[in-house]
Amino acid sequence: MINFRLYDKQLDMDLDDWSTKEYSKYYDDVHKYALFNESISQVYQSYIDSPDLMDSISDKVIVVENGKLKIAIIIINYYESEKDNKKVLGINPILINPKYINKGYGKQIIQYLIDCKGRIFDMNPDRLYAGIDVDNLRCKHLFESVGFKLVGKTDDNEFLYYELEL
């Protein structure tokens, strides 16, 4: 059974290992698609230092566990859409523990968010959203496989936008 909890800088310092070359063969993908040459604690600190950076109702760094195993980190941006005033839970990014990529955890996590209609912590969204690097075929396949629809892309064609109405 998976469990979602807020990132705790003291408790979760070991997650910084996920961003090292020694940890797994997915080092390049981890940095290209999720961490952008930072550690997880640095990403977390950037949200602490700039709480209004994303113009969100709230932003959360979430640890996903399966029992005692830390299987993923998700950055959640919860905001109100400017186009229709609906509440949106943005998943940006989801980082599966690199030792467990391609083991089905990503799909299990996203399906859980769909099944609970994104109602985690204090959020009650109308839709789920994900911004995905155009080259991240693994992530595009994951979101498409659970029903997300492509709704747009950046002007430079580097990122695709996917949504799922709840």
Model regions and ranges:
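Conserved acetyl-CoA pyrophosphate-binding loop and the N-cap/start of the following alpha-helix
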Residues: 100, 104-112
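C-terminal "cap" of GNAT-fold acetyltransferases
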Residues: 151-166
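Conserved active-site alpha-helix within GNAT-family acetyltransferase domains
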Residues: 107, 133-152
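Active-site acidic-Proline motif in GNAT/NAT acetyltransferases
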Residues: 97-99, 103, 134-135
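Conserved GNAT acetyl-CoA-binding A-motif
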Residues: 119-132
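Short acidic/glycine-enriched loop/turn segments that link adjacent beta-strands
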Residues: 85, 136, 156-160
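Acetyl-CoA-dependent GNAT
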Residues: 5-99, 116
